[in-house]
């Protein structure tokens, strides 16, 4: 070690786990506010579960032979007590676990929603990350196709609220367990006839999860998959009536859809209705929301037999679409940036900034970066860059006279003058600023 300090290696974030920086946070806040307003309109209540759960929750709930459980989970052994734990790769199983554990269904069905980070160990690419965010709904205790239709309609309403276009709905029915079992037998027989043409992934799934072979993206297998037995042809009267009821409700609400017999979803807990919202604007990662019915899951995780359905959507993918379609809202600046010169002015500025905040105004008070006072010119540059509507200026003369100078940074002032600096008594500052902001807003509406 020399006398000179060695330069420390710069630390970076984990690949596929991204920072959300201030310039992007406004878009996240816009989306979150929009979706929360929508969910309130449908009577959904927020639930928040831990990001770490017992591994068994996912192996039992999602399915041991799914891609998520086999190769995508971040799992570890707790050094304190030897428990096998996992960073949640999805949240439906966790919400169901919480509902069972806290007896949430004792007094009837529940409409729940969540928003938060999920984790999957996979190759990062556009729209697919190792830490990603999902918003989702879980309608617990609802058995009819009307619940399926409602959660699908929620998605369409969200696209409308966000201004998104070109997102198309695909639906399918996975039927009941006995129907899937009969289809599985015939599907395996069919795929065995083409086993020499199947890729490694399809061969691995052939006897463990053959339904997932139908979801392959390998171009070389598309003809084989296209001619495979379709689960929809194995549906019994109950499953078909449920699927027909869903279609009738979607048509009644003028919501176009396509029946995709190859739509199977990657989680074992689904039955009856499954659906995806897809777009061609995100390349290979075209699914922006997906869900369906999972009636067996609550009993599977230790609860009483209870019907349920829900969906989840990838927040990052939706934000990509908003950027793609130039629907990013302009970030609003604060109301006031307070500038000051001299010790007496700094003290007075501090007091006034707090008083302005008491009235509900958003205020940035200039604070020195190096302990020394910045020049007036430098402070005004920062005020302008902050996006503030007004600069409130304290100098030695203003402090001596009990006044402040107010300079509009956007639009006009209280009297209609554009960017004209005015002297205002300190005791009248709040009223002046409110009137000035009203005038600015009206000027912007003209």
Swiss-Prot record:
Keywords of the record, alphabetical order, are: Aminoacyl-tRNA synthetase, ATP-binding, Cytoplasm, Ligase, Nucleotide-binding, Protein biosynthesis
Q: Does the keyword Transport apply?
A: no
**PROSITE patterns recorded:** AA_TRNA_LIGASE_II (PS50862)
Q: Where in the cell is it found?
A: Cytoplasm
**Any single biological process term in GO:** histidyl-tRNA aminoacylation
Q: Which GO terms describe its cellular component?
A: cytoplasm
User: Which Gene Ontology MF annotations are present?
Assistant: ATP binding; histidine-tRNA ligase activity
Listed EC numbers: 6.1.1.21
Reactions listed under catalytic activity: tRNA(His) + L-histidine + ATP = L-histidyl-tRNA(His) + AMP + diphosphate + H(+)
Principal cellular location given in the protein's record: cytoplasm
What does the similarity note say?
Answer: Belongs to the class-II aminoacyl-tRNA synthetase family.
Q: Assembly and partners?
A: Homodimer.
Listed name of the protein: Histidine--tRNA ligase
């Amino acid at each position: 070690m020399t006398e000179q300090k060695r330069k420390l290696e710069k630390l970076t974030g984990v690949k596929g786990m991204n920072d959300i920086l201030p310039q992007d946070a406004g878009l996240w806040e816009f989306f979150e506010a929009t979706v929360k307003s929508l969910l309130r309109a449908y009577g959904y209540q927020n639930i928040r579960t831990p990001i770490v759960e017992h591994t068994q929750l996912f192996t039992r709930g999602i399915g041991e032979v799914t891609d998520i459980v086999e190769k995508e989970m971040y799992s570890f052994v707790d050094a304190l007590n030897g428990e096998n734990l996992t960073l949640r790769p999805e949240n439906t199983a966790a919400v169901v676990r919480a509902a069972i554990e806290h007896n949430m269904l004792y007094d009837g069905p529940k409409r729940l929603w969540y928003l938060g980070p999920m984790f999957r160990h996979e190759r990062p690419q556009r729209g697919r990350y190792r830490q990603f965010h999902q918003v989702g709904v879980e309608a617990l205790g609802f058995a009819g196709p009307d619940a399926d239709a409602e959660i699908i309609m929620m998605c369409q309403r969200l696209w409308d609220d966000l201004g998104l276009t070109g997102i198309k709905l695909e639906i399918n029915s996975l039927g009941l367990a006995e129907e899937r079992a009969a289809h599985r037998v015939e599907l395996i027989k069919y795929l065995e006839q083409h086993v020499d043409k199947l890729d490694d992934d399809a061969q691995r799934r052939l006897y463990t999860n053959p339904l997932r072979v139908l979801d392959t993206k390998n171009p070389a297998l598309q003809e084989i998959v296209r001619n495979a037995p379709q689960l929809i042809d194995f549906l019994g009267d109950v499953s078909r009536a449920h699927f027909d009821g869903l279609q009738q409700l979607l048509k009644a609400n003028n919501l176009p859809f396509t029946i995709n017999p190859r739509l199977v979803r990657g989680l074992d807990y689904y039955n009856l209705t499954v659906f995806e919202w897809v777009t061609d604007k995100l390349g290979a990662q075209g699914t922006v929301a997906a869900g369906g019915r999972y009636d067996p899951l609550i009993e599977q995780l230790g609860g009483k037999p209870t019907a349920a359905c829900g969906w989840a959507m990838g927040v990052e993918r939706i934000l990509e679409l908003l950027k793609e379609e130039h629907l990013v809202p302009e970030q609003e600046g604060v109301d006031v940036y307070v500038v000051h010169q001299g010790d007496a002015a700094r003290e007075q500025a501090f007091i006034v900034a707090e008083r302005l905040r008491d009235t509900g105004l958003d205020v940035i008070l200039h604070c020195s970066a190096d302990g020394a006072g910045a020049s007036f010119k430098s402070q005004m540059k920062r005020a302008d860059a902050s996006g503030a509507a007004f600069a409130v200026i304290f100098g030695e003369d203003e402090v001596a006279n009990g006044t402040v100078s107010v300079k509009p940074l956007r639009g006009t002032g209280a009297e209609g003058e554009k960017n004209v600096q005015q002297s205002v008594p300190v005791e009248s500052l709040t009223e002046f600023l409110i009137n000035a902001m009203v005038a600015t807003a009206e000027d912007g509406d003209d």
